[in-house]
């Protein structure tokens, strides 16, 4: 029966492996069925239940210890295998058999003690073999002679003492890189490189750095051609260095790298004699790196390098520099991370590329004379330019690439006269002055790339980009605009495909700011101060694919619909904004949910307000913005009722006043027998006939007349209601042609109708003073209807007619009136039903 400890030793690795391949979670797998990263899972053997389709397998840091034959037969498609630090001590014959597609094998950090002659058999496609720190003592016993496809062999940090290249190297015809750095090689003899004489490897790059070199036999490298030779930290004294470099005589190398590594210097001193032996080499490109010595008279140091095409100094301290003059035939000069006493004087007729970056000292730029220069990189030097830029500054009219980024103050005093061939221009993180005073780039009609990011530029001039008709990429992040408003400054940039306006403190933009940018594909508006998403300015961007509005303060979209986004848009970034998750913005929040395929990292879009929803993902938001139907119905009905009441009160204000008066005076005494309504045109008849006969007759009747009985200073309407109707038993309406045409008379008549309706004892007596045309009478529908249906008195100016008229009128007025011969007037409001004649 299996012991508990043994069972645990089996189950723990198995469980670890299953955690790697379970379908629910492919971690730590990178690409299911293709790439598996199973580091540090405590495997003691090669897992056999990975899919056959596996192409990339990382088993590093597992205690495999032993690789037997056909260890990887389950992975016939394997292309990359990493076995770093797996404590492998033994590799048997055919361990990698069946891996015919394997191109990369990494064995770093394995203490190999037994390596069978057929250990690497079957690797018919292997191109890269890394055997760093594998206790390898000699290349002679390394069984790789059959790996004809091998391009890169790295055996650094081993115990190799001899540089002798075995005869099998003649089979490695595709070998391009051999790394023997950090071994124990001290001497190189002619016989060590015999195989390279017999079978030249013209593309071979050889790294011998960090070997304690003491001797190179003269002629050892004679007539040998290499692509690259690196010798860094190889020599412990200047004399040894001189001797070894002289031993390289006859070598033809495309690129030679000499020097030391940072903080690992062995040399105590360095002078011009160290490189004298280079005169016997044929070199195309030369690099000297990390010599932390104060070199004086550096030009004499490179007398043997006047004809190299490329010259490079990296991390070299130079006390004094004479002219880099026309004697040098360099086409490419690179000075990186060096220390200068002053900016060097450059006068190089054939130089096409100058890289002068990250240097210290000599902060003031001085003019150079480089008539063939096409590429100039002066970045990261802290340089200041009193005037920039024109042909006289650089001594060339052929310049196509100019990088002045990460420098000091650059004062723009010229619009690049003589530099019309420029295609690439970079000013980022320098301090530009006078940028908005004139059209700085007016001459640069061939410019394709422009970067003025973080240059303290304040755009106050709409013609700042005039002339840039060929520009495709514009980066201007970290600058500012007048009033934080983006104006129409891109009108000439019709070929622009990339525009970066991030971190510009923008709050608003012109609706036509981008109208001319029909070719624009990428627009970055992030890190600004927009509070709403305005889609209208983008309607003309028919080629736009990427729009970044992240890290603004966007709460919602503007009121217009969101259809103005171009149909070409594929990626919209609205992350890290201040979304307001309220009912007021429900349509915008719903739009976000509908456009989740368009939005970048939509799951990171979170609510900022209100406080109870802060931090909540917009996608998971579920706002109920519909009110209860009953509440809505009651609210609407209440509004309608209030509105109708208000309209009725306004329209029937005087009728309501009459109603209030009837309630107030309904049971009081009447002062008048009748209130007379008539036209002022009929006032003579009223005075001479009506008043005289009724008030002076027997019995006498008291009439209410406006010219006599209305109270001065009171509104006419109030007098009509309070003095006329409320204090009278009856109403006499004198109908005439003038009456019908008078608005006041009609108003009084309408109030009289309401009064008659409200008071059961009230009565209206109509007197038709003269014949009225029916067409005129029909204009007053209610009056016409009443006269048609009710009895009325008609005035006739004859003896008989008068007699009948006054008798009938007195009879009508006596109805409801208490009268005694002594002339005492009784109550008139006895609430008996009135008789209307």
UniProtKB/Swiss-Prot annotation:
LRR repeats: 53-74, 77-98, 101-122, 125-146, 149-170, 174-197, 203-223, 225-245, 329-349, 350-371, 372-392, 398-420, 421-442, 446-454, 470-493, 495-516, 519-540, 543-563
One Gene Ontology molecular-function label: lipopolysaccharide immune receptor activity
Keywords in alphabetical order: Cell membrane, Cell projection, Disulfide bond, Endosome, Glycoprotein, Immunity, Inflammatory response, Innate immunity, Leucine-rich repeat, Membrane, NAD, Receptor, Repeat, Signal, Transmembrane, Transmembrane helix, Ubl conjugation
Positions of the LRRCT domain: 577-627
Membrane-traversing stretches: 630-650
Post-translational modification: Phosphorylated on tyrosine residues by LYN after binding lipopolysaccharide.
A single Gene Ontology CC term: ruffle
Pfam families with a match to the protein in the record: LRR_4 (PF12799), LRR_6 (PF13516), LRR_8 (PF13855), TIR (PF01582)
Topological category with respect to the lipid bilayer: Single-pass type I membrane protein
Signal sequence bounds: 1-23
Extracellular side: 24-629
Ranges for domain TIR: 670-813
Glycosylation sites: 33, 171, 203, 280, 307, 495, 524, 573, 622, 628
Subcellular localization: Cell membrane; Early endosome; Cell projection, Ruffle
Gene3D superfamilies: Ribonuclease Inhibitor (3.80.10.10), Toll/interleukin-1 receptor homology (TIR) domain (3.40.50.10140)
Any one GO BP annotation for this protein: toll-like receptor 4 signaling pathway
Topological domain ranges for the Cytoplasmic compartment: 651-837
Family stated for the protein in its record: Belongs to the Toll-like receptor family.
Entry note about domains: The TIR domain mediates interaction with NOX4.
Protein task: Transmembrane receptor that functions as a pattern recognition receptor recognizing pathogen- and damage-associated molecular patterns (PAMPs and DAMPs) to induce innate immune responses via downstream signaling pathways. At the plasma membrane, cooperates with LY96 to mediate the innate immune response to bacterial lipopolysaccharide (LPS). Also involved in LPS-independent inflammatory responses triggered by free fatty acids, such as palmitate, and Ni(2+). Mechanistically, acts via MYD88, TIRAP and TRAF6, leading to NF-kappa-B activation, cytokine secretion and the inflammatory response.
Protein name from the UniProt record: Toll-like receptor 4
Lineage of source species: Eukaryota, Metazoa, Chordata, Craniata, Vertebrata
Gene: TLR4
């Amino acid at each position: 029966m299996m012991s508990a400890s043994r069972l645990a030793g089996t189950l723990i690795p198995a469980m670890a492996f299953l955690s790697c391949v379970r379908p629910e979670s492919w971690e730590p797998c990178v690409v299911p069925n293709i790439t598996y990263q199973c580091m540090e899972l405590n495997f003691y053997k090669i897992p056999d239940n990975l899919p056959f389709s596996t192409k990339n397998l990382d088993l590093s840091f597992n205690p495999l210890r032993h690789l037997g034959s056909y260890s990887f037969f389950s992975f016939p498609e394997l292309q990359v295998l990493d076995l770093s630090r797996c404590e492998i001590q033994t590799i048997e014959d055919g361990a990698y058999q069946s891996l015919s597609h394997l191109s990369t094998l990494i064995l770093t950090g394995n203490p190999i003690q037994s390596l069978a002659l057929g250990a690497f058999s079957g690797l018919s496609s292997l191109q890269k073999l890394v055997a760093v720190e594998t206790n390898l003592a000699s290349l002679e016993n390394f069984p790789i002679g059959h790996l004809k496809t091998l391009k890169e062999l790295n055996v650094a940090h081993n115990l190799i003492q001899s540089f002798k290249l075995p005869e099998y190297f003649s089979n490695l015809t595709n070998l391009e890189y051999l790394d023997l750095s950090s071994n124990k090689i001290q001497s190189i003899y002619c016989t060590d490189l015999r195989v390279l004489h017999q079978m030249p490897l013209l593309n071979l790059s050889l790294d011998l750095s960090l070997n304690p070199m003491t001797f190179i036999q003269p002629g050892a490298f004679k007539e040998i051609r290499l692509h690259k030779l690196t010798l860094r930290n190889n020599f412990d004294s200047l004399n040894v260095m001189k001797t070894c470099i002289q031993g390289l005589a006859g070598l033809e190398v495309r690129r030679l790298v000499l020097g030391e590594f940072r903080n690992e210097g062995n040399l105590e001193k360095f002078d011009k004699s160290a490189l004298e032996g280079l005169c016997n080499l044929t070199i195309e490109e030369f690099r000297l790196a990390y010599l932390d010595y104060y070199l004086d008279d550096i030009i004499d140091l490179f007398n043997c390098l006047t004809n190299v095409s490329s010259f490079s100094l990296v991390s070299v301290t130079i006390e004094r520099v004479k002219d880099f003059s026309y004697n040098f035939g360099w086409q490419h000069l690179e000075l990186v991370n060096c220390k200068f006493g002053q900016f060097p004087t450059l006068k190089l007729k054939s130089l096409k590329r100058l890289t002068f970056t990250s240097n210290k000292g000599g902060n003031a730029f001085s003019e150079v004379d480089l008539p063939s220069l096409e590429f100039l990189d002066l970045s990261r030097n802290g340089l200041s330019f009193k005037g920039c830029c024109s042909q006289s500054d650089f001594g060339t009219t052929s310049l196509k690439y100019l990088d002045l980024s990460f420098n000091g103050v650059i004062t723009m005093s010229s619009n690049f006269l003589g530099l019309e061939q420029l295609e690439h221009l970079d000013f980022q993180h320098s301090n530009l002055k006078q940028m908005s005073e004139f059209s700085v780039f007016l001459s640069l009609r061939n410019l394709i790339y422009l970067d003025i990011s973080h240059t303290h530029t304040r755009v106050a001039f709409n013609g700042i980009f005039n002339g840039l008709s060929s520009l495709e990429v514009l980066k201007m992040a970290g600058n500012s605009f007048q009033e934080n408003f983006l104006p129409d400054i891109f009108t000439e940039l019709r070929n622009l495909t990339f525009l970066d306006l991030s971190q510009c403190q923008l709050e608003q933009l012109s609706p036509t700011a981008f109208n001319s940018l029909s070719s624009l594909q990428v627009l970055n508006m992030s890190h600004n101060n927009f509070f709403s998403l305005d889609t209208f300015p983008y309607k003309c961007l028919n080629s736009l694919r990427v729009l970044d509005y992240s890290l603004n303060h966007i709460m919602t979209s503007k009121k217009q619909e969101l259809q103005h986004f171009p149909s070409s848009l594929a990626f919209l970034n609205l992350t890290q904004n201040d979304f307001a998750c309220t009912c007021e913005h429900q349509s915008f929040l719903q739009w976000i949910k509908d456009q989740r395929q368009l939005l970048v990292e939509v799951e990171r879009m979170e609510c900022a307000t209100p406080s109870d929803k802060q931090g909540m993902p917009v996608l998971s938001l579920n706002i109920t913005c519909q009110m209860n139907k009953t509440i809505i119905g009651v609210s609407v009905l209440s509004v309608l009722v209030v509105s109708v009441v208000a309209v009725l009160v306004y329209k029937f204000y005087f009728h309501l006043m009459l109603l209030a008066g009837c309630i107030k005076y309904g049971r009081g005494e009447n002062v008048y027998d009748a209130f007379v309504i008539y036209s002022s045109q009929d006032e003579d008849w009223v005075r001479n006939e009506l008043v005289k006969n009724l008030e002076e007759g027997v019995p006498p009747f008291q009439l209410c007349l406006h010219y006599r009985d209305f109270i001065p200073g009171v509104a006419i309407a109030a007098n009509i209601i309070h003095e006329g109707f409320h204090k009278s038993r009856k109403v006499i309406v004198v109908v005439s042609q003038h009456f019908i045409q008078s608005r006041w008379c009609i108003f009084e008549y309408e109030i009289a109708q309401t009064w008659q309706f409200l008071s059961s004892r009230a009565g209206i007596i109509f007197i038709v003073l003269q014949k009225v045309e029916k067409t005129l009478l029909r204009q007053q529908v209610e009056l016409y209807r009443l006269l048609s249906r009710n009895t009325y008195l008609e005035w006739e100016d004859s003896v008989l007619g008068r007699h009948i008229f006054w008798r009938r009128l007195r009879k009508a007025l006596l109805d409801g009136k208490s009268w005694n011969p002594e002339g005492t007037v009784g109550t008139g409001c006895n609430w008996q039903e009135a008789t209307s004649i």
